[in-house]
Regions:
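A short glycine-rich, Lys/Arg-flanked "PGG" loop and its adjoining helix->strand segment in the class I
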Residues: 18-33
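A short SAM/SAH-binding and catalytic strip from SAM-dependent methyltransferases
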Residues: 1-18
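Short "lid" loop at the C-terminus of a central beta-strand within the Rossmann-like core
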Residues: 8-9, 42-46
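Conserved Class I S-adenosyl-L-methionine
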Residues: 49-75
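Soluble non-cytosolic domains of exported or imported proteins
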Residues: 14-21, 52-59, 95-96
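Mature catalytic domains of secreted/periplasmic carbohydrate-active enzymes
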Residues: 23, 66, 71-77, 96, ...
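Conserved beta-strand signature within the Rossmann-like core of class I S-adenosyl-L-methionine
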Residues: 34-43
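Core SAM-dependent methyltransferase catalytic element
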Residues: 68, 84-109
Length: 109
């Protein structure tokens, strides 16, 4: 089993972190033991409200996933060092090439 959550977790998290947690918990019920959720989203600035920029901090996503009971692994595959995280993801200068985290959330066996 696999589910992909692509660049949407911030939309659940920023207005209400509990809403994002509930989404992950609901997705978890759809997975067999050992099933995975792939999560990618735009990296935000630590200690800042990232909602206007449509971003979130990587650690926020990891904390949510662990709180939902997933085993979490991360990858640097989608990192983009030219993105300074201070612009909206819709800023034309970024050309949608944002710095993104990539997480593998696995439902325990």
């Amino acid at each position: 089993d696999a589910v992909i959550v692509a660049q949407t977790l911030h939309d659940y998290y920023n207005p209400n972190p509990d809403r994002a947690l509930n989404m992950l918990l609901q997705l978890k019920t759809l997975l067999k033991p050992g099933g995975v959720i792939g999560v990618t989203d735009h990296i935000g600035i630590a200690g800042r409200d990232n909602s206007d920029m449509h971003r979130m901090q990587t650690q926020q996503a990891i904390d949510l996933a662990e709180q939902a009971g997933f085993d979490v692994e991360s990858s640097e595959l989608l990192r983009s060092p030219s993105d300074d995280h201070s612009r909206s993801i819709f800023d034309p200068r970024l050309n949608r090439n944002t710095d993104r985290f990539l997480l593998k959330l696995q439902k325990p066996l």
